[in-house]
Amino acid sequence: MPFYKIAEMQKNRATANPQQFVQTAVGEFMKAGIVTKPDEEGPPLHMHPNEEQFTLVIEGKLHFVLGDEERICEPGDLIHIPRFTNHRSRAIGGPAVFFTVKSPAGDGDLDQDYNKAEGAEQAEKRFEEAKRKTF
């Protein structure tokens, strides 16, 4: 059973958004990773038809759109993303780091089940509004 030291894990650029860095560990039924997002970065609104996901914010703030809800998530906030739920996050006010777990493990790529969702452009407008309100 492996132990991992995050500081020693290889950083790779994310497939869906190359501005992000991911450090990934893959098990039999789950995949997990530490994701670092630069300020205002993140993939467009998307969903995962085959994966359930949990995300825990570790550092910074994320503007998160989850289904019909949106909020600013901070360290200690845990987000559950069911399959088929449109979502996206952007670091806001500086870079952000989060831990995420997805099931099933698939091929181990955190972006494996990425499917851009309808309404992605509208979600970006919501981010611009959130930036104005926050800062």
Where are these regions (language model features)?
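A generic "binding-loop/recognition-motif" signal
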Residues: 39, 50, 69, 85-86, ...
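A short glycine-rich, His/Asp/Glu-containing loop-to-beta-strand
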Residues: 10-45
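Hydrophobic/aromatic beta-strand elements that line small-molecule binding cavities or substrate pockets
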Residues: 35, 54, 77, 87
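Short, conserved beta-strand element in jelly-roll/cupin
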Residues: 36-38, 47-64, 101
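Short, charged/polar surface micro-motifs in flexible loops or helix N-caps
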Residues: 28-30, 38-42, 61-62, 70, ...
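Short acidic-glycine-tyrosine-enriched beta hairpin
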Residues: 68-83
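Double-stranded beta-helix
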Residues: 3-5, 9, 29-31, 88-135
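Short beta-strand His + acidic residue motifs that chelate non-heme Fe in jelly-roll/DSBH
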Residues: 45, 64-65, 81, 87-93, ...
